[in-house]
């Protein structure tokens, strides 16, 4: 017999046709879970989540997951970020982890030795980091070649742009950041900190296809860039509301793409600055989402299209709610 988690027993089971293929079985499972989690939240589920919410801090990844209606929005957030159901890490995500670890190592060595390490040393570190992801042999070979080529091109083009004042993986978990009533946390890939002039500039590394502008051409790219831009705003709020860096001037933020452009071979980056009004509105959005999360009042997104337009509309509707 199938055992149902006790906090889901209030949900009336829906009979779904049997599935014969793995793909069909996955679809059935996803549909069934979506229906269960879209039902009104039981008191027992709220009790299960209460200890988590007592110490919960909102990260930009969790915020993005809550807002992205193209990927399930609040229900996806509940399943993956609050209930923390296990999910397989994709080969692309494993590749991204290895690239980030390699660049973190570069910054750590530069900060310690005050000179750039040889490219070969970083490439060896990348291989070791990728091996630690335990990819299938074909995926490992594919991403080893891809990452080696990308890092070689990136380090060749950007070697003069690295500084020993840059701090990798600056963690704000214990900085006491509260924005819009929400406890926030996060790590900055790179923070260039000028203690004399009290300025801080943030760089976030991105793997994958680079973008030439903030506009985006496809719906997928528009959603991706929308999230990226919110990520940089989130980091500015983290810095300005933190214990140690609140009195620093936020000098700017950059998305630094690691992989070269397919057509030109150029290494691209996107920078942006945000107005006081834009940051205030984003902080208000964070506050609304925080209250939804902590009250476990997850909005029904069935009326929104699963695309960029639906995501923007969802955010606008959240902002219009009475605080």
Where would I find each of the regions flagged by the language model?
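Secondary-structure transition/capping motifs at alpha-helix termini
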Residues: 109, 157-162, 194-198, 242-248
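A non-catalytic, helix-rich entry segment at domain boundaries
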Residues: 102-178, 267-277, 290, 314-323
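Active-site-adjacent bridging/hinge elements
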Residues: 69-79, 121-123, 199-213, 257
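Metal-dependent nuclease catalytic regions and adjoining charged, substrate-binding loops involved
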Residues: 12-28, 236-323
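C-terminal, charged and often intrinsically disordered regions of DNA end-processing helicases
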Residues: 3-109, 305-323
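Glycine- and acidic
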Residues: 61-62, 79-89, 110-111, 128-138, ...
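Generic recognition of stable, solvent-exposed alpha-helical segments in well-folded globular domains
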Residues: 2-6, 58-61, 73-77, 90, ...
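Non-catalytic protein-protein interaction segments used by genome-maintenance enzymes to assemble
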Residues: 167-242
């Amino acid at each position: 017999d199938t055992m149902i988690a006790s906090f889901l027993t209030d949900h009336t089971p829906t009979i779904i046709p049997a599935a014969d293929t793995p793909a069909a079985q996955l679809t059935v499972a996803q549909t069934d879970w979506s229906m269960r989690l879209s039902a009104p939240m039981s008191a027992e589920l709220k009790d299960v989540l209460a200890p988590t919410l007592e110490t919960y801090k909102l990260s930009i990844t969790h915020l993005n997951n809550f807002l992205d209606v193209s990927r399930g929005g609040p229900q996806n957030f509940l399943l993956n970020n609050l209930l923390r159901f296990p999910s397989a890490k994709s080969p692309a995500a494993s590749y991204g982890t290895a690239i980030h670890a390699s660049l973190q190592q570069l910054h750590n060595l530069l900060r310690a030795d005050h000179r750039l390490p040889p490219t070969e040393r970083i490439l060896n570190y990348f291989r070791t980091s990728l091996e630690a992801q335990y990819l299938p042999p074909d995926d490992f070979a594919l991403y080893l070649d891809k990452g080696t080529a990308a890092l070689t091109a990136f380090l060749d083009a950007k070697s003069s742009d690295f500084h020993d004042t840059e701090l990798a993986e600056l963690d704000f978990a214990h900085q006491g950041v509260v924005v819009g009533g929400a406890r926030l946390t996060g790590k900055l890939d790179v923070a260039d900190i000028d203690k004399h002039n009290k300025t801080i500039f943030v760089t976030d590394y991105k793997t994958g296809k680079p973008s030439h502008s903030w506009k985006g051409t496809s719906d997928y790219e528009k959603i991706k860039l929308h999230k990226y831009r919110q990520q940089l705003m989130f980091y500015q709020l983290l810095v300005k509301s933190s214990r140690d860096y609140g009195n620093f001037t936020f000098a700017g933020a950059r998305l630094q793409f690691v992989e070269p452009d397919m057509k030109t071979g150029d290494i691209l980056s996107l920078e942006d600055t945000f107005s006081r009004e834009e940051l205030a509105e984003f902080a208000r959005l964070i506050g609304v989402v925080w209250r939804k999360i902590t009250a476990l009042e997850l909005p029904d997104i069935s009326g929104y299209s699963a695309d960029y337009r639906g995501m923007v509309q969802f955010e606008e509707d959240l902002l219009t709610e009475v605080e």
